[in-house]
């Protein structure tokens, strides 16, 4: 069946103003604004209330010493304790730091084992500095090679 191009153009021109179907507005996407985190906190607070946890005020900082020598440091910390259930909760943003970063204020918090580890750490640091100084002395005697430059003229 042949199609008359003039009639087709005329029909397209007439139907250009007619819209088929209704207007659709875009659905607004829901953004996750941390509601899942709030639910977890609410559940945690409810459980602590069941345990009759007591909030401890005026805690400046908390440090958890790890076996690998690093420290979990809580600068601004909230603490709740339920001693009858052997439960303690620490709230805050933890930062993983090296032991050296927290000196000298952390010395009073260290136990006997940590003080031994501290003396070993000091010995390791002294050895590392001695090795660096020895390495620098060796490097001064070795000239740097530059492409296109010869050292024969300097020797004579």
UniProtKB/Swiss-Prot annotation:
InterPro entries: BTF3, NAC_A/B_dom_sf, Nas_poly-pep-assoc_cplx_dom
Name of this protein: Nascent polypeptide-associated complex subunit beta
Name of the gene: EGD1
Organism of derivation: Candida glabrata (strain ATCC 2001 / BCRC 20586 / JCM 3761 / NBRC 0622 / NRRL Y-65 / CBS 138) (Yeast)
Subcellular location per the Swiss-Prot or TrEMBL entry: Cytoplasm; Nucleus
Entry keyword Protein biosynthesis: no
Domain NAC-A/B: 38-103
Pfam families: NAC
Family, similarity comment: Belongs to the NAC-beta family.
């Amino acid at each position: 069946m042949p199609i008359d191009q003039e009639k087709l153009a005329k029909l397209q021109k007439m139907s250009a103003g007619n819209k088929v179907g209704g207007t659709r507005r875009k659905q607004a996407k829901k953004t996750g604004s941390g509601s899942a985190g709030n639910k977890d906190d609410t559940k945690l607070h409810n459980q602590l209330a069941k345990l009759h946890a007591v909030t401890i005020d005026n805690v400046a900082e908390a440090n958890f010493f790890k076996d690998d020598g690093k420290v979990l440091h809580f600068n601004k910390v909230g603490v709740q304790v339920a001693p009858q259930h052997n439960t303690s909760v620490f709230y805050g943003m933890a930062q993983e730091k090296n032991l050296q970063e927290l000196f000298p204020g952390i010395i009073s918090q260290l136990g006997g084992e940590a003080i031994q580890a501290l003396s070993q750490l000091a010995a390791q640091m002294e050895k590392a500095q001695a090795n660096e100084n020895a390495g620098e002395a060796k490097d001064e005697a070795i000239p740097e090679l530059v492409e296109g430059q010869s050292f024969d003229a300097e020797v004579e």
